[in-house]
Amino acid sequence: MTSTTPNSPIANTAAATEDYPLSAVPPQARKSLISLAPILIGFTLYSGTLFAGGLVGPSVQFWPDLMGLILVGNLILGVYAALLGFIAADTGLTTVLMARFSFGNLGSRWVDFILGFTQIGWYAWGSALMAKLLNTLAGVPESWNGILILFFTYACCSTAYFGYKAMDWLSRIAVPAMVILMGWSLLIANNDVGGIAGLQAVELGDPLPYTAAITIIVGTFISGGTQSTNWSRFAPSGKTGFIATLIAFFLGNGFLIFSGAFCAKVYGNPDIVEVMAQQG
């Protein structure tokens, strides 16, 4: 009878195909910083982060208040995620497997449930946003939204089937495209408001305590930061895992918070879909 023990060739091949979900990533499967950083940056380029920035931007002065909040908030988030990335790269284990060392078998199930539950909302938000974009910008009837949401949800989930390799190739396309799109939007917004001087003169919206602003910036992606270890574990060393994760969450997440806050401050609207429609 064919052997399927953990050390057999068949078992090792299956583990490699599934990206080692129940074991540490072996040395030969580790990835470089150049491969890992774009994946983690792509992970942070989440549409909900734009809305988070949109909630903060109109309520505070652009300089130095808003820039300071973005810097501090994303530094907190980045260091938190980077420390987890260091541990993940050092152990090679997934988020849930590492949770067993902290919370035990039963406790780790609760961790898995809580983090998994947040992803339901994450997918729901992203898929609904894509449907709204098509409604607003392409004139697709709202009666199609159910089908559109299902399509985009399964399209996003499909990357999990193909694992790291699919995320690697997708990030090479999606990250530059997202940066170009948001850069273009920021350029239009900057021209519309009359530069930084015009932005400084924009009337402030309802006041928002700095503690609440920091909570929004950090809290919007703290769950994602916790689960980023599922990718940072592929780093060849703890140092590389730390650097790749810090780059992604401090710069990548910070860029989206800044973009959402900037555009919301210019147009007085935190809804990025309506902002894009207004920009044409």
Residue positions per predicted region:
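Extracellular loop-to-transmembrane helix junctions
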Residues: G54-G85, R100, G107-R109, F249-F250
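Hydrophobic alpha-helical segments and their helix-loop junctions in multi-pass secondary transporters
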Residues: P176-E203, Y210-A213, I217-F221, G260-Y267
